[in-house]
């Protein structure tokens, strides 16, 4: 008997809490919005993290966490990234090239063993620019 799910990989994507929602509800009702959540969940189940970098940026800002430190840590825990940028207040799915910190982070990392998804809600030209940028890394 094979272990359930051994023929494929199941991922859990990190969630997002905006500052507006955090202030409105005065708590964080979501699972897996922070590095701490990842560490706690990892103690209970073995799972593959789908790291949505833009979700982490918004959640880090909303919860007063260190985005760069947590991004470095979680980057090493995953082989799958969702990429877009935002203003750290809302998950707006902007071009990754609009965020110089994200661009520098991506340039500094070895992405060869990562699966990347562009999650950009802008016009096709922006998506193509992001795609070409990633393809050259």
For the regions a protein language model found, what residue spans apply to each?
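Active-site acidic/histidine proton-transfer and metal-coordination neighborhood
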Residues: 1-48, 58
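Histidine-acidic metal/acid-base catalytic patches
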Residues: 39, 43-53, 57-137
């Amino acid at each position: 008997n094979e272990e359930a799910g051994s023929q494929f990989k199941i991922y859990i994507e990190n969630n997002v809490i905006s500052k507006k929602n955090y202030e409105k509800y005065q708590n964080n009702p979501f699972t897996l919005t922070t590095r701490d959540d990842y560490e706690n969940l990892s103690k209970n189940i073995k799972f593959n993290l789908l790291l949505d970098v833009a979700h982490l940026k918004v959640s880090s800002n909303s919860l007063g966490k260190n985005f760069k430190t947590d991004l470095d840590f979680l980057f090493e825990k995953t082989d799958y990234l969702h990429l877009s940028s935002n203003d750290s207040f809302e998950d707006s799915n902007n071009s990754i090239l609009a965020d110089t910190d994200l661009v520098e982070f991506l340039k500094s990392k070895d992405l060869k063993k990562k699966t990347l998804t562009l999650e950009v809600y802008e016009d096709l030209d922006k998506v193509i620019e992001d795609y070409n940028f990633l393809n050259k890394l």
